[in-house]
Amino acid sequence: MNARVESVRALMDERGLDALLIKGKTLKRYLGTVTGSGCKVLITRAGGYLIMDGRYVNEAADIEHDLEFRVHEQGVSYLGELAILIGECDIHRLGAEASQVLVSEYQKLCDLDVEPVLLDGELARMRIIKDEYEIAAVQHAVDVADDVYAKVLEHLHIGMTEYEISALVHYYSIAAGAEAMSFDTIVATGERSALPHGRPTMR
């Protein structure tokens, strides 16, 4: 996680930011932190914080080592805890993901006497260059997909439905170590194979 946090800090330096607020699942996963919607990450020049309600404490404790926990009451906005950190860390320019900030949040940030700086493409570009772990993970995923495809082919026979084929793909993927399917399995036969994202049917 440290190398990726340093990439975030390098971006902060480029944009003259004192801190970066992370709400989106993709970037939280990139940093190896809890991805639940009730978790927000604040990276400052000197440290990092995981702002969350009590539901996530046990999960976070299992995987977090670099972020300081700030826990607020469930059902209460994270902005109260963020306001405390803005004061403690002397934050004046706060970066945030443009696609993740509500208008109401933006207005409240302005009320906290902080300058919100919305980032868009910069965060995506930061993740384009893959590290060794990511390259290995992509290669492993490709290997698993190849293996699953070969196993499913062994079981195909006339009369199988698309649902049955989809179930095999799902089963062998999970058996190989997948956590979940990233989207509905694409299985389409006959003229349905022309569909851009053919979801399985009883055909």
What are these regions (language model features)?
Residues 1-84, 143-144:
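N-terminal accessory/capping or targeting/presequence segment of soluble
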Residues 13-14, 33-34, 42-43, 88, ...:
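Solvent-exposed alpha-helices and their adjacent loops that cap or buttress functional pockets
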Residues 72, 135, 200:
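Short pre-catalytic strand/loop immediately N-terminal to key active-site residues, enriched for Gly-Thr
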Residues 41, 138, 187:
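Divalent metal-coordination and catalytic microenvironments
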